[in-house]
Amino acid sequence: MKKLLFTIAISGILAITTAFTSPTVSKLVSKAGHINFFSHTAIEDISADNFKVVSTLNTATGEVVYSVPMQSFEFEKALMQKHYNSKKFLDTKTYPKAKFKGQITNLDAVNFEVDGTYNVTIAGEMNLHGVTKVITETATITVLGNKITVETKMNLTLADYKVAFKGGKPSTNIAKTIEVTSKSEYTKEG
């Protein structure tokens, strides 16, 4: 009987100790993610950066969510920024945020507790300019110590989201498909 009580007591202590020492936080937040978009045409290259991207990564479920403040993209030229934000293009006053909510489809390929680089596929819904599309993209997750970095590069066809200049110089200066790169860093607690 004493052995049984001793075993139960030790099991309880181990369970409590494990509960308080194991990393239980599975939802991580990045408040300063970076997104760059790049457009190449024969006339000019256009690039813009946004360092105010907020995202979450749930390491237990594989859910990823991104919120992108569209007016926070910074351009080399003020006129580019004006065209980008205008009602004739992205209309960022009406559509102030782009959002993505998705899932890592091969979560079992990632060990968030072991340093390494993992190739994953993320599928979900992208909402941009009031249009929601289902997309599937590849990404790289790097685990190094208590840091987790998620990076992806994809091509985005503007017409899919009803984004286009109807005519004039801006319509010939921006590519129909742009390259979008994203990098978000998360810190594990503990």
What positions do the PLM features span?
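Short amphipathic alpha-helical "recognition" segments used for binding
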Residues: 6-7, 85
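Low-complexity, acidic/polar, glycine-enriched regions of mature
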Residues: 20-190
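Bacterial N-terminal signal peptides
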Residues: 8-17
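Positively charged n-region of N-terminal signal peptides that target proteins for export
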Residues: 1-5
